[in-house]
Regions:
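C-terminal tails and terminal domains of large nucleic-acid-associated
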Residues: 521-557
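Residues in well-ordered beta-strands of folded domains
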Residues: 15, 31, 139, 301-302, ...
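Short glycine-rich phosphate-binding loop at a beta-alpha junction
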Residues: 96, 389, 551
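Conserved hydrophobic residues forming the short capping helix/wall of the S-adenosyl-L-methionine
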Residues: 111, 405, 540
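Conserved beta-strand scaffold positions in the cores of enzyme catalytic domains, especially
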Residues: 14-16, 122-124, 195-197, 332, ...
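Hard-cation-handling environments
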Residues: 205-335, 339-521, 529
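His/Asp/Glu-rich metal-coordinating catalytic cores
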Residues: 2-74, 79-292, 311-325, 344-347
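A glycine- and charged-residue-rich anion-binding loop/surface
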Residues: 20, 44-48, 52, 69-70, ...
């Protein structure tokens, strides 16, 4: 490890607000005295038990508490786990965004959807350009990833230089643009780097990550071997290089290309408009035009590679897509690997497609956009940091990168595995976690942001598991005498027509309860509701071993 040049004795605070010990929701604050810059601002997708939740974004309480210090956001690339929370966060902290051209283009579309395009300042940054904000100077470095225009960041502070790789791979033969700027990593390394924050996603995988161009050869073989079939290819919408290679194959084999899926249409529109996607004249057709061409002259590029229930491919598979129906002998290609948690959904879609007679190809048509072990070692050798700080990944991924650092000669004192919320204070003299800040999940449900918490989720889980029983009764004002009811309405508990005797017995339990309350002159609504819930709940549990949500409703006349 090379000793860094002696720096100011002040300490840089590195505060991950999300993205550690998880996949997604990446966001990290860098603080020095009265300046804070934020690197990326991503979302994650809900866990299976987050019923009804659309998105999960980071809790930015710490940034709001220090809003006067926050100078800007630096974005490494345009994936949802790095930009998805921007519209929500910038409604509360409106500071400039700095990113490369394509990344800004994707962010612009998001801001436009939220009506924020005129209120948020964005600046396109070129590779090699430096941005000065407060105590910081930030340089963008060319990298490769599964989306174009990805960048690493060299963050210059009075305490030293921190290199943040963002999501990256080492690709010497990219489909578009230049290879990763390894020379610049080496030049910065010679200056003396305090810390390297390196992508850990593939830290468990040995070897080097394959070039994106290798997928092009596989795709070409598929087009060659399936000349007589319609081809449908599902991939990540953001993988513009993959889309480019599919279009290249389509042109070579004389096929028209139809794009399906909202996110796919959006990304292709942005990428082609900004010059990141080359579209031969007249190669694109609308999905409605497919019927005008023989199957062997068409290819459909679609969303749904992860088995998402509402994505285009899923709707094709289950027969609910209005414009595309799966035909026997269709060739369907999954040009992706299932992300953790989506394996079951992907397998289900593959089975449905095969049942319809389609030929499904789902192996060896994808390469990762993340660095494997040898790529990570290469970056370490070039940057030669004093401290290793693994980022981006679950705990096991962070540990895997820590082991790589150990193999390269780093002792445990110079490897910092952080958790979201940790405050790492670091300079030339040392690095230590000195405290924690508040972090957590903010759930987005439709137009509601943060108004759904664990209590609401528990209610939804209970409703999903055991259903609901509503007890309706009418009482006379003043005397509290029962005039009508109690009547029972249930949903998701039992099928009433097949459980009439159970419901009759439940009605008897309620009648007995109300008679007892009347005899005891109980007129307090709160007491009545509690007694009704307890009596009915005990009966239902005894008879069914279920605990539905019970809601008594009292009307007074």
């Amino acid at each position: 490890m090379k000793k860094t040049e002696k720096q100011n004795t002040g300490k840089l605070k590195i505060i991950p607000l999300g993205g550690l010990e998880q996949i997604g929701m990446n966001i990290t604050a860098f603080e020095y005295e009265d300046s804070i810059i934020v690197v990326v601002c991503g979302l994650s997708f809900p866990e299976d038990d987050m019923l009804g939740i659309d998105l999960v974004i980071p809790d930015i309480t710490y940034l709001k508490e220090n809003i006067d210090k926050v100078k800007g956001f630096f974005i490494t690339h345009g994936h949802e786990d790095h930009i998805g929370a921007i519209p929500y966060v910038l409604k509360e902290i409106n500071v400039p965004i700095y990113a490369t051209k394509l990344t800004i283009g994707i962010i612009d579309r998001k801001l436009e959807e939220h009506g924020m395009l005129k209120t948020v300042k964005r600046k396109v940054v070129k590779y090699g350009q430096h941005i000065n904000l407060g105590c910081f100077r930030v340089e963008f470095i060319k990298t490769n990833h599964s989306i174009q225009d990805a960048a690493a960041l060299a963050i210059y502070s009075p305490a030293g230089i921190v290199v943040h790789t963002g999501d990256f791979k080492v690709d010497y033969t990219p489909v578009f643009g230049d290879a990763i700027d390894l020379a610049r990593f080496g030049e910065i390394g010679k200056k003396g780097v305090l810390a390297l924050m390196c992508d850990s996603t593939n830290a468990e995988r040995p070897g080097f990550t394959q070039s994106e161009k290798s997928v092009g050869k596989v795709l070409d073989g598929i087009f060659e071997d399936h000349r007589k079939n319609r081809i449908i290819i599902a991939t990540f919408a953001s993988n513009v290089d993959r889309v480019q290679q599919i279009i290249n194959c389509a042109e070579k084999y004389g096929r028209k290309v139809a794009i399906e899926g909202r996110s796919m249409v959006n990304i292709i529109s942005i990428a082609s408009e900004l010059g990141y996607l080359s579209l031969p004249d007249n190669i694109l057709i609308d999905v409605e035009q497919l019927r005008s061409y023989p199957d062997e002259q068409t290819v459909i590029i679609t969303t749904g590679s992860q088995g998402e229930s509402m994505a285009a491919l899923s709707r094709m598979a289950n027969g609910t897509h209005r414009k595309v129906s799966i035909k026997p002998n269709d060739t369907i290609v999954f040009s992706s690997n299932p992300i953790p948690g989506s394996e079951k959904s992907v397998t289900g879609i593959i089975n449905e497609l095969m049942m319809k007679g389609a030929d499904v190809i789902f192996q060896d048509v994808h390469v990762s956009g993340h660095a494997c072990q040898e790529d990570i070692k290469l970056i370490y050798s070039l940057v030669n940091p004093k401290y290793a700080i693994p980022v981006h990944g679950e705990y096991k991924h962070l540990v895997a990168q820590a082991k790589i650092a150990e193999q390269l000669g780093y002792d445990t004192d110079h490897i910092k595995i952080l958790s979201s919320g940790d405050v790492l204070e670091i300079n030339e003299d040392g690095a230590k976690v000195t405290g924690r800040v508040h972090v957590g999940n903010v759930m987005v449900d439709g137009l509601g942001v943060g108004d759904v918490g664990n209590i609401v989720l528990r209610d939804r889980q209970r409703l999903a598991e055991d259903g609901i029983i509503i007890v309706v009764m009418t009482l006379e004002a003043g005397s509290g005498q029962l005039l009508a009811g109690p009547d029972i309405v249930s949903r998701g508990f039992v099928y009433v027509r097949n459980s009439e005797s159970l419901m009759d017995e439940a009605k008897c339990v309620l009648d007995d309860t109300m008679e007892r309350l009347t005899d005891n002159n109980v007129t307090d609504w709160g007491k009545i509701k509690t007694e009704v819930k307890d009596a009915l709940g005990d009966f239902v549990w005894k008879e069914t071993k279920r605990r539905p949500m019970i809601i008594p409703i009292i009307m007074e006349v």
